[in-house]
């Protein structure tokens, strides 16, 4: 599965149609448009994808490439008009021409099939994304959730125990 995120659906369709026309041997590849889906499906689809495609000229502040990198999904993308600081050749495959996306994607697919994708691409992407992730906040939230769960269970247990003690005394 190739997850794809563009600003306009026409751009998405242009990439997909051009890819299938130019490389019919890859007709078995499924594309998934990532615009307008809920957060749970979004993360699920990113995990299932073997590569993400991002084309957005207008915004250099889109989080889609970072979310892809965080889920260890390599990114192929067009460099936006305002290039973000985190975007470099180590953490993704970037081009200045949207027309090159299809050729780069085909080459990436071929390398993926031949198992020629460097682990460095995955590692650098995760390293880049981790700069923007608040892991401590996430860990704190998870720890608090489990502690609250334990406290509620403990209160229920103590309540049941106190009821039994009261019944014994009577």
Protein language model regions, located:
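Short alpha-helical segment that forms part of, or immediately flanks, the ligand-binding pocket
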Residues: 43, 66-70, 84-85
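Aromatic "clamp/platform" in nucleotide-sugar-dependent glycosyltransferases that forms part
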Residues: 57
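A charged, aromatic-enriched C-terminal amphipathic alpha-helix characteristic of glycosyltransferases
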Residues: 113-168
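Short hydrophobic beta-strand element within catalytic cores of glycosyltransferases
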Residues: 74-78
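Short alpha-helical donor nucleotide-sugar binding micro-motif in glycosyltransferases
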Residues: 44-49
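A short alpha->beta transition loop at the rim of the catalytic pocket in nucleotide-sugar-dependent
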Residues: 50, 72
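Conserved catalytic-core segment of nucleotide-activated headgroup transferases in glycan assembly
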Residues: 1-42
């Amino acid at each position: 599965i190739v997850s794809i995120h563009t600003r306009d659906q026409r751009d998405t369709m242009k990439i997909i149609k051009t890819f299938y026309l130019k490389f019919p041997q890859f007709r078995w590849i499924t594309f998934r448009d990532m615009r307008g889906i809920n957060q749970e499906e979004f993360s699920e689809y990113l995990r299932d994808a073997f590569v993400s495609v991002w084309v957005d000229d207008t915004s250099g502040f889109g989080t889609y490439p970072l979310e892809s990198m965080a889920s260890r999904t390599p990114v192929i993308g067009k460099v936006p008009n305002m290039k973000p600081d985190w975007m470099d050749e180590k953490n993704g495959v970037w081009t200045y021409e949207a027309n090159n996306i299809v050729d780069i994607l085909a080459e990436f697919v071929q390398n993926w099939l031949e198992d020629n994708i460097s682990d460095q691409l995955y590692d650098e992407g995760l390293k880049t994304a981790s700069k923007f992730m608040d892991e401590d906040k996430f860990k704190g939230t998870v720890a608090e959730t489990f502690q609250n769960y334990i406290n509620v269970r403990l209160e229920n247990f103590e309540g049941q125990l106190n009821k039994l003690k009261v019944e014994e005394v009577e």
